[in-house]
From Swiss-Prot:
This is Methylthioribose kinase. Its EC number is 2.7.1.100. The lineage of its organism: Bacteria, Pseudomonadati, Pseudomonadota, Gammaproteobacteria, Enterobacterales. InterPro entries: Aminoglycoside_PTrfase, Kinase-like_dom_sf, Methylthioribose_kinase. It catalyses: 5-(methylsulfanyl)-D-ribose + ATP = 5-(methylsulfanyl)-alpha-D-ribose 1-phosphate + ADP + H(+).
Amino acid sequence: MSQYRTFTASDAVAYAQQFGGLSAPEALVSAQEVGDGNLNLVFKIFDKQGISRIVVKQALPYVRCVGESWPLTLDRARLEAQTLVAHYQHCPAHTVKIHHYDPTLAVMVMEDLSDHRIWRGELIKGVHYPQAARQLGEYLAQTLFHTSDFYLHPHAKKAEVARFINPEMCEITEDLFFNDPYQVHERNNYPAELEADVAALRDDAALKCAVAALKHRFFSHAEALLHGDIHSGSIFVADGSLKAIDAEFGYFGPVGFDVGTAIGNLLLNYCGAPGQLGIREAADAREQRLIDIATLWHTFAERFQTLAREKTRDAALAEPGYASEFLKKVWADAIGFAGTELIRRSVGLSHVADIDTIRDEEMKLSCLRHAIGLGKALILLAPRIENADEFIARVRQYG
């Protein structure tokens, strides 16, 4: 049996030749490390013509941006691969294809998406992909419905929950989303000028109680197999195409967490647009983000209800009207989780380029304050925002 070792570029080429599923594997001759994430090595594998044909991804046993002082389980590579395989089974159009994975080496071989772009980068530049929000809503509906109690037999669902237990990666989420921003912690990362804003988060008892309720749902509601980190940097887009990648945080959790994380990242772009684009372009981009959020939610909710009507196997859950009631709870959860995403990306360890790459420091501070204030408002108001129109009105109200 092979033992874990950190891959070099030549290791990645040899592995792709063996497991890439190409008809002429000997044509693969070189590799380039392209990963900019905190948790993994990612290699593009090129043929003799210099064309990227396949991707090899290997998990590292520590958080890359911190170093070996923050160790991580290598089992997350298995969990990521199996999450993506399961999601591909239910939504192949919008999930990256995994050709092979090895749990011992913590490595997987996947399709190359060089003809796509990372959605976050396109959003920052003001490039609009008209289909993206609808396709993301479709991906979320298909993957979350088909791994939920609506579709799975109870025995199969319980077995899947056990197979996807992911405590170490969930602990990272629990800390970064629900703990660190609301206490003094060395992982937090924000400009000194925001100290009063961050202190106000720590001192807000009502806010922290609402965050505690969201954390409790994250702990205890094993509703469906989540992607677990579905932000705009883990989504590739092209004309007419969207693909989800990077699912090492996959586990069974509340449906609203994936939906809310996606919405939260669109809102981060909304908050950062004035610092990235000209006045008119920023206004157009912000308006489009609100349309994208409404499109994402409506697509998700309508598809989920259609699937529930046509495919629900449990007699009680198939009761007319129940899926609609379930989605009301998902919506409230999603708004709250979107708020936690806004706050943690503004003051916590891991930021987003939508705001961090703004060159004007005063503008960056303004955008960060906007994200923090909007995040706080969404967390507190989530139970009272009944639909997408009300949601958009609230977002406009806070700038």
